[in-house]
Amino acid sequence: MLLVQQVDQAVHSVSVISYILYLFFNHCQKMKLLLYPHGGSGNHGCEAIVRSTLKMIPTATLFSSNPDEDKRYGLDAICTLRAAQAPMSHLSLAYWKAFIRYRFGDKEAFDRTSFRSIFQEANSDSYALSIGGDNYCYGVPVFIYLVNKQLRKQGIKTILWGCSVEPEVLKGDILNDLRSYTHIFARESITYEAMKEKGIQQLSLFPDPAFQLNRTDLTLPEGFAEGNTVGINVSPMIIKHEKAKGMTLLNYRQLIRYIIATTDMQIALIPHVVWNYNDDRIPLQFLYNEFKGTGRVVLIEDHNAEELKGFISRCRFLVASRTHASIAAYSTQIPTLVMGYSVKARGIARDLFGNEEHYVLPVQSLQQGNDLLKAFQWLQTHEDEIRKHYRTFMPGYLAKTFQAGQLLQTL
């Protein structure tokens, strides 16, 4: 009889949980989610945020600066794609309305009209998620201000989703815009604490949604040894932030030489952004050309975010400069060293490990050609310790990402 009662209680508990999940996802289906701004999936970190967000809130319209690029990586299969800015003929009624408003002193009239597809899509059931992650870290985001201002004027809830912001920029127009969001989801504690200090109240701390990105395991290329390959990612962005010219690539070259000379590990060069003006394949191709004759180095071609995560997850270590390459590794419990330059790398590592020391090497700090090598040697020495920490810590951390989706539907 006792066993029967226990079974009945278990069945009842499962039924209650199933019903709660049904209510949550049924509500999510009714939500009208507008995702903006999105520069295109050639930045696979941007793509990863979109894909992971749609695991939580499955129905959305993505307003993209490059819808054709998003189609190339398959986003049209999981969401509605719209161009963020619509062309405007000089013969159109929209143009002449904007022209008249401009002549009467509305200096934003033309810009606002170019983004009209977003404003026309929005209604009282809409949630507008600003998804760039670090859009407030690269100068004054004037077009984000403009879109936010108009959406708020229409009574639309605006959400800053999975963000990092350098503490020193929290002032003036940026701070005013941040204070006007319905809610802000900070993705790491440095940003969260800095915003709290500035009096921002509508604020939560959750992991970057991309920690929940699915992985797709393609056939590994020849030269990629599963479980015994060091993944390497280099970006033009970190090279721009180096203090001594050439120091970044010198450090990567020294690291590769060390791996080839002293270990039996292979090396996979993995791009994560392939935009023409910011293409990881350029520095990676440089490294590949130098070491391809060793037979120890493979250059991974461009793939979508889930496929890239599949390659990263089968590495033994990752040394990366792109945030979402590192997130792909963290979330699959790969010991990772980040060559970083900003708050996002430091903040995420601090939340995962308690501090960023040994896990993030600021590119600005590079002074010697073996700085990266020494940091990697520490990672090697502590490999077992890091993996043990992942096993106990990561399941709970990953679970928090879906809690962000649950909070979103209550706002």
Locations of regions flagged by a protein language model:
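Active-site anion-handling motifs in enzyme catalytic cores
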Residues: 25, 30-411
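Intrinsic-disorder-associated, low-complexity terminal segments enriched in Asp/Asn/His/Tyr and depleted
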Residues: 8, 12, 19-22, 26-27
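Low-complexity intrinsically disordered segments
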Residues: 14-17, 77
